[in-house]
Amino acid sequence: MTMVRPFAPADLDRVMEIWLAANLQAHCFVPAEYWTGNAPQVRRQLPQAELHVYEAGGAVLGFAGLQGDYLAGIFVDGPARGRGVGRQLLDRCKALHPVLTLHVYRQNPRAAAFYRREGFAVAAEGIDPDTGQPELTMVWRRAD
């Protein structure tokens, strides 16, 4: 069975595996030590966020994390990428929030293109203060 469902505490280890692997792969322009060094803090903070997981056949293949209307990220397990997992997670977020804002690194054109296809528009450009990397602020608004 395939579904998008709320995060459960038992998902934490798998969600962290996906978070680290996805960040290392998609953001190879950021030193790996940044991601590995931040993993313990992320592990502590994730359960306080609004998380939705994509599960297929009893396995978590991806998740979306939000803080209010801020989409902190959509993370999909490598072999599951390109199969609609991210879109289903984003659809769940859109169903629950009339406005979504996110940041995406300029050097991650695949993610920026995904969000553009899904109706997000660039609202601003800036620099991520934690990594020093150029980033785009993108916004989506539900059409009424």
Name what the model sees in each region.
Residues 1-10, 140, 144:
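Conserved N-terminal entry element of GNAT/NAT acetyltransferase domains
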Residues 12, 16-43:
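Conserved GNAT-fold acetyl-CoA-binding loop/helix
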Residues 41-53, 70:
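A short helix-loop-beta-strand connector motif used in the catalytic cores of GNAT acetyltransferases and
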Residues 50-62:
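Conserved beta-hairpin
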Residues 70-81, 105:
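A short, internal acetyl-CoA/4′-phosphopantetheine-binding micro-motif in the GNAT/acyltransferase core
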Residues 82-95, 113-117:
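Conserved acetyl-CoA-binding loop-helix of GNAT-fold acetyltransferases
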Residues 95-107:
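Conserved GNAT acetyl-CoA-binding A-motif
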Residues 116-125:
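Conserved acetyl-CoA-binding loop of GNAT-fold acetyltransferases
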